[in-house]
């Protein structure tokens, strides 16, 4: 349970395995990290499980209690993903939670079914656990657990008191030493931190400034232990309506989905239920868009569900012929809706609204990507976040350029965006937003095999205020594609991928 992303799953797996009949009398243990607000609930769940197990004639289990061992990585991951850090915000809170869990774990009714491993090198925490166990008469259910070589005098003193001590010794073969470097660096980082006990432990004696510092640290944690909240800050819920982001001149990235929380896992199951077609429904017919009008063509491309073994048709999309392509180009060139006349501020507002709508349709975009291209949910999710970021970034950046001296922003005319199949959302959105942000009209020709995704996200832009004449989405045959790419009215082409 070292990484937060694995914590809830590991606990469920631990219980599921020990519930198997062959493991009824098997004594097993699991680690709980006190720096997580979830730790209290983890302990509660383990206590309920252990009591039912022992009452049913099964063996007790063990909980190894540590302060936490992945702080830096959790902080980095949370920052990159735009999520709240799952770790308690201060060392005092972490220490307080550790003491809270210690006291609860050493109570007689709890310790007899859920044995406790006290993993710490902090003399004050160790002494507190020792005195609690003496008070409750639960010393026999407790072990002290330490790392070899880090505070040997402490475990020797423990042994002299008759306490059971478990020493952990990292072992690595010479040829694998490189793999141990990250562990070594982490130990060095923790042990030299200003608030870490071991930093102040050398020549530690009562009535010294080091002793007083550590004693005060313990007293503050002890005073806080009964006043903690045990609610995880990871509360993202994709089942709720999206909260719109107002237009801003400061760019802030859209958070990815936190799949570690149960409510978002349920959200994924709902996506699957919605997008997995049985084959009995009539497939959707996606028309050809020619400006503000739509036409259903005889020549259509069929899309099968890439997530199913059976040939289930999801939809069919109309393909443009050469004459229709010429009409589409004419509309983009003449710009009847006047998109090129809009101000940068107007486009900035519309792009932010489009970003909000893209974020709100995240589930359907992911479902469409999974079904049409066979992407995984995680792959599709980060694409949606990137698309939302593009929609906000280009006009935000363009406003900064417009504020510079001797800079004048003019549209080029009509932009053709040709995008690949393997990134069916993020890359085409980036291309069309780059064009629209500059006041250009845009024709999007996505990869044919992934085009339904483009049709879906285009609705976000149209609904946000982009005229359909300013953003047209088409697929074509090769002959018509040549007409599109060689037309003099096309002033710029953004091409990513192959020649499809």
Where do the PLM segments sit?
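Feature representing long, continuous alpha-helical segments
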Residues: 96-103, 127-130, 156, 182-183, ...
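Generic, well-ordered alpha-helical scaffold segments in large soluble proteins
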Residues: 13-20, 42-49, 101-108, 128-135, ...
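Terminal low-complexity tails and localization/encapsulation signals of metabolic enzymes
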Residues: 163, 174-330, 334, 341, ...
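Glycine- and acidic
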Residues: 1, 27-28, 84-88, 110-115, ...
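Generic beta-strand/beta-sheet core signal
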Residues: 1-2, 31-33, 64-66, 115-121, ...
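Positively charged, amphipathic and often flexible ligand-engagement surfaces
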Residues: 1-253
């Amino acid at each position: 349970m070292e990484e937060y992303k694995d914590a809830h799953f590991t606990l469920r797996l631990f219980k599921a395995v020990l519930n198997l009949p062959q493991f009824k009398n098997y004594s097993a243990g699991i680690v709980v990290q006190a720096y997580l607000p979830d730790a209290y609930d983890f302990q509660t769940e383990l206590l309920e499980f252990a009591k039912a197990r022992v009452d049913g004639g099964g063996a007790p289990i063990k909980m190894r209690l540590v302060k936490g061992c992945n702080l830096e990585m959790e902080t980095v991951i949370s920052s990159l993903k735009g999520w709240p850090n799952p770790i308690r915000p201060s060392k005092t809170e972490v220490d307080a939670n550790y003491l809270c869990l210690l006291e609860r774990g050493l109570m007689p009714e709890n310790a007899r079914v859920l044995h406790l491993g006290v993993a710490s090198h902090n003399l004050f925490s160790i002494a507190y656990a020792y005195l609690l166990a003496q008070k409750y008469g639960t010393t026999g259910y407790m072990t002290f657990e330490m790392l070899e070589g880090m505070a040997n005098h402490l475990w020797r003193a423990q042994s002299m008191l008759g306490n059971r001590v478990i020493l952990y010794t990292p072992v690595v073969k010479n040829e694998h030493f490189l793999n141990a470097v990250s562990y070594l660096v982490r130990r060095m980082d923790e042990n030299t931190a200003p608030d870490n006990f071991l930093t102040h432990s050398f020549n530690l004696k009562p009535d010294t400034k080091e002793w007083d510092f550590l004693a005060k640290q313990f007293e503050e944690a002890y005073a806080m232990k009964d006043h903690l909240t045990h609610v995880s800050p990871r509360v993202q819920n994709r089942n709720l309506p999206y909260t719109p982001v107002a237009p801003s001149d400061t760019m802030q990235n859209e958070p990815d989905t936190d799949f570690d929380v149960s409510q978002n896992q349920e959200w994924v199951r709902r996506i699957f239920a919605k997008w997995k077609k049985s084959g009995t429904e009539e497939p959707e017919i996606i028309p050809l868009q020619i400006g503000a009008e739509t036409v259903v063509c005889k020549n259509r491309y069929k899309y099968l569900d890439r997530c199913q073994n059976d040939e289930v048709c999801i939809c069919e999309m109309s393909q443009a012929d050469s004459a229709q392509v010429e009409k589409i180009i004419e509309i983009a060139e003449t710009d009847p809706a006047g998109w090129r006349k809009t101000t940068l501020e107007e486009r900035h507002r519309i792009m932010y609204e489009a970003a909000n709508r893209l974020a709100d349709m995240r589930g359907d975009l992911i479902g469409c990507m999974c079904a049409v291209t066979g992407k995984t949910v995680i792959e599709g999710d980060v694409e949606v976040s990137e698309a939302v970021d593009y929609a906000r970034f280009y006009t935000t950046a363009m406003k900064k350029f417009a504020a510079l001296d001797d800079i004048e922003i003019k549209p080029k005319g009509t932009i053709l965006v040709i995008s690949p199949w393997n990134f069916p959302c993020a890359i085409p959105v980036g291309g069309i937003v780059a064009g629209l942000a500059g006041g250009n009209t845009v024709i999007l020709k996505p990869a044919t095999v992934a085009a339904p995704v483009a049709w879906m996200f285009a609705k976000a832009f149209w609904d946000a205020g982009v005229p359909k004449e300013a953003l047209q989405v088409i697929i074509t045959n090769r002959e018509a594609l040549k007409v599109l790419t060689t037309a003099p009215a096309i002033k710029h082409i953004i091409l990513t991928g192959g020649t499809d």
